[in-house]
Structures are given as C-alpha cells and as structure tokens.
Amino acid sequence: MHAGLPTMTTPQDIIRRDVLAMTSYPVPDASGFVKLDAMENPYPLPEPLAAALGERLARVALNRYPAPRPAALLDKLRHAMGVPGTCDVLLGNGSDEIISMISVACAKPGAKVLAPVPGFVMYELSARFAQLDFVGVPLKADLTLDVDAMLAAIAEHRPAIVYLAYPNNPTGTLYDDADIERILRAATHSLIVIDEAYQPFAQHSWLPRAGEFDNVVVMRTVSKLGLAGIRLGYLVGRPAWLNEFDKVRPPYNINVLTQATADFLLDHLDVLDAQAAELRAERARLAQAVAALPGATVFPSAGNFLLVRVPDAAAVFDALLTERVLVKNVSKMHPLLAECVRLTVGSPDENARLLAALKLALPD
C-alpha cells in the first residue's frame, strides 16, 4: 500500500454480520444426470404447442418494459384458477419473490415468522433476510402436523406471518383440513400464507375459500405444473393485503417473455393438467416400487416427489450419483429427516433409471 493512501473499505466493513455468516443457496450442476432433485415437471411442451409459443414470443416487444400489472393476464388467471370474486391476484417472479415481498412488508421490529419444520427453506431464509425472527414448530415423528404445538406456539409468539405449505416440502405431507382450520381460527393476529406450490399433484386447495378469512392469502407457482423456467408465482387474497404487498414489489418484476408465455399457456391448461395426471400415476407406481426395496421407507406424498428414509442417506446419494442420477439428500436439513432422501417423480424412463440405481444402492 502506498504511504498516505486511506485504508480501503472491504465487504466485511459494510455487509451485515448475519449475511457474512451465510452461504449461498446451493444448486448442483446437473449436466449429464437424470435430474430428480428439484421437483420439476420432466415433460416438455408438445412440439406443435412449443412451435406456436415460439411464434408468439417472436412478436413480443423486447424493447419495452413489461406491464407492471398486466390486466389481461390477471383476468385470465383469475378465470382459469377460479379466484373468488372478493379476492385479487398479485404476481411474483416465482413464489420466492412473493415470500420476500411479504417478509419485507411485515418486517416490523420484533415481528416473527412461524412455520412447521422441516418445511420450505425460503420461509426461514426470507425472514432472516428481512431481519424477522423465525420460529419453527417441529412436525410429529410421522411428519404430520403437530397442531397442538402449532396452537401453543402461535399463542406464545403471536407471529406476524404463519406459513402452511399444502402439501409440505420436503415431506410431501398434506395437512388435515380440520387442523388447518383450527390454526386459522386461532391465529387471528397473524397473516396466514397457505402455500399451494404442489396443488396440481395434491388436488386439494384452499384457494376457493381464500375470501372467507380476513387474514388468509393463498400462494401458488406455475413451476411445478411444468413452467419452472419462466419463474411465475401468484398470490390470491383480499385486496387490503395485496395492495400493501404491491408497494414493495419491484415495478417491472414479471418480464415480457414470462407474461406472454403464461398468457399463451393459460389457454392450454388441458395439456399441463394431463402431464400432472401422468405424474400422479407415476408417483403411485414409483412409491410402490421403492417401498419394496430393502431398508426403504416411503412417506405418503401429495407432491411430485417422494421422501424416502434409507439406512444411509449419504451412501445412497453417492451411489445414485455414480449411476448419473441426481436426487436431494435432505438428511442434514432437520433431525426429523435423518437418513432421508427426496426423489422427484420423473418420466417413466427416468423413474426406471432411478429404480435401477436404487436397487444397486440398496442390495438385499
């Protein structure tokens, strides 16, 4: 350093200490693997539909900013998804952005976020980013909702936000409707966010009832339906809530290509629904086959994935990697997930390769 020059500022001088202590969200390189780690729909669009979409996208004005609230798309979404008349719709760049908007808008000093654990990691991460306290309420040993513990935690902590994933990720659990209603009735001082990211595979929904409760919003994404690449989530709830969240939404958060793709494919939901039906059938076949393997315990799932407990999760994960099959080792995420791996339900060919690899990893 030259004499007389001031000491330069470093990131450590400026960045929050809790951020410095974090690590980036890990996303493994899946090149050359059968990719069964991220709950994606394995099916591409049929070729004629993909070609028609390509022609539509070629006409999009890339030189113009996107509409901040695309009225035609929102109306089409309301109609296609059966949004109650008393509710509005807010779009996000994936449900992750919606979670972030909710966290930022509700980040009063001392406010808390509460959710069952293990659950979707972004509930806690987004809370931490917004400097909200996160309270995790463990599921029961069978990975069902501990409703009494939830009610006690709500009474103790009076959280600003309560997340209920319906069904839950990574467990696949579809919480009992009566238990959810007990939580809704008890958490009168909280915003309840019902996360229905996997609704196409659960075939159960609280969205039709979103307008019945003053403090309930329902969140969905098109990712699991087969459109993970366009990053589009939406929130349904009373305008009084959504108008406030809209204030912290980046003004051009949904790009023109995403808007055009969603508008086009909402006219072809029958294709995506048929793919979801095929994946539900594959889920049943895969669950039965995996459960027959030595040492494997398959938990009931209402998502497009299976949570499986094996004798040694790390060894199974590595053995599958050797066979060029990528799954998710969730065994370190929470004590209730000890020795568990999460398997995305793929196409019949992908599932056959997964089963062949699992048979090598779990010999008799």
Curated annotation (Swiss-Prot):
Molecular function GO labels: histidinol-phosphate transaminase activity; pyridoxal phosphate binding
Pfam families, per database record: Aminotran_1_2
Catalyzed chemical reaction(s): L-histidinol phosphate + 2-oxoglutarate = 3-(imidazol-4-yl)-2-oxopropyl phosphate + L-glutamate
Modified residues (N6-(pyridoxal phosphate)lysine): K224
Signal peptide: none
E.C. designation(s): 2.6.1.9
Cofactor: pyridoxal 5'-phosphate
Pathway assigned to this chain's UniProt record: Amino-acid biosynthesis; L-histidine biosynthesis; L-histidine from 5-phospho-alpha-D-ribose 1-diphosphate: step 7/9
Keywords, ordered alphabetically: Amino-acid biosynthesis, Aminotransferase, Histidine biosynthesis, Pyridoxal phosphate, Transferase
GO biological process: L-histidine biosynthetic process
Family assignment from sequence similarity: Belongs to the class-II pyridoxal-phosphate-dependent aminotransferase family. Histidinol-phosphate aminotransferase subfamily.
SUBUNIT field: Homodimer.
HAMAP family: HisC_aminotrans_2
NCBIfam families linked: hisC
Entry protein name: Histidinol-phosphate aminotransferase
Organism field: Burkholderia multivorans (strain ATCC 17616 / 249)
